[in-house]
A protein has these predicted regions:
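Catalytic cores of carbohydrate-active enzymes across secretory and cytosolic contexts
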Residues: 1-205
Length: 205
């Protein structure tokens, strides 16, 4: 997509110790993606430890994979999670052109749509949930489920891997807020599957 004439910005976090200069913008493989810029969000080592290593992996990851009895929910971790999501939203709001489409990825950034919509109502917001979305009975163990569902409902589009996960999300949303279905559209009538090898490189922002 970005190898053509389309321009875009990838907003990503980068660990920053708080000492020395921090480069907020950098290129990403300029020969292959000349129109793609990286906007770096500085996170302290403590932010990374709490937001990603501890909270995302100890609270949300086991819940999403239906191991709710292993989840550890801490209010102080949730507050750090909110602060990091707000940083992502602010950086995105600063970078996005008027009426641009913003594509947000996965549960680590659940609260970005809420913050972003408040700052930039002109944007078209899409969210893809790469991780499995469980049944409402499982998701309801999350203490902040209403805040999370409310944030996701700020999106113009929400994508999931399979129809069952869509149904799970709708059930969770129905339990959190009163709503009604105003329209339905069928998905593709047939699917084509094929196998392929996927190479995974590494990139530090």
């Amino acid at each position: 997509f970005f190898k053509g004439e389309h321009e875009g910005t990838w907003v990503a976090w980068s660990k920053h110790e708080g000492r020395g200069r921090f480069e907020t913008h950098t290129d990403f493989e300029p020969e292959s993606y000349p129109n793609l810029t990286v906007r770096r969000v500085p996170l302290s080592p403590a932010d990374v430890e709490t937001f990603y290593q501890r909270f995302s992996k100890e609270a949300f990851w086991p819940t999403l994979h239906t191991f709710w009895e292993r989840a550890r929910f801490r209010e102080e971790d949730w507050q750090t999670y909110l602060q990091v999501n707000q940083k992502f939203a602010e950086a995105t709001a600063d970078e996005a052109a008027e009426g641009a489409t913003v594509w947000i990825h996965d549960y680590n950034l659940w609260m970005v749509p809420a913050y972003l919509r408040a700052r930039r109502p002109d944007l078209k917001i899409a969210f893809f949930h790469h991780t499995y979305f469980p049944s409402a009975d499982v998701f309801n163990v999350v203490p902040w489920r209403r805040e999370i569902i409310g944030s996701l409902l700020q999106c113009d589009y929400i994508g999931f891997h399979i129809p069952r996960q869509v149904e799970n999300f709708v059930d969770a949303a129905r339990g959190a807020f009163p709503f009604k279905t105003v329209a339905r559209e069928s998905c593709a009538p047939r699917f084509q599957t094929y196998g392929c090898a996927v190479g995974l490189g590494s990139m530090t922002s």
